[in-house]
Amino acid sequence: LWGAWLHVDVINPGTVLATPDDLTAAAWARQHLPEDALVLVNSTHWTNTARRGSDAGWWLPLLGSCAVTLPNALYIQGGRQRFDEANQLAIAVEEAFDLCAPDLLRQLASRGVTHVYVGAAGGPLTPARLDACRAYVPLYVYGPTRFYAFSPESVASR
């Protein structure tokens, strides 16, 4: 037990989801995103049935004062329908081969997604994948962080 005290300040880098670049992006979000914005965020598998954020997007409700598609860990306690809907959308994005696929764009639009965030820690939503589709319009770029407006109409107007 004595040796454990020597490691009390050791931080697992895999658990650090918010970097200084993310904090700057969150400050931008507080000033520029509309109050009713719903931000699509990166996610990954967590427990048997739950997902978790894979970057600072998961913390945007606290850091950036905006709603996100995957609420914090307590979303498990928010009712079965809310839990299932959050998981279904997260899994659809995680497993998407093409972020511009019509079915995915329809699903994002039907859930009310207005913006997308890519944090420094990353996940399945990457700048390269989002930049390849006109439905995701870059609004903010700072280091590895990005905010996009979600505009599925831009794809339909090709």
Roles of regions detected by a PLM:
Residues L1-R158:
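Extracytoplasmic
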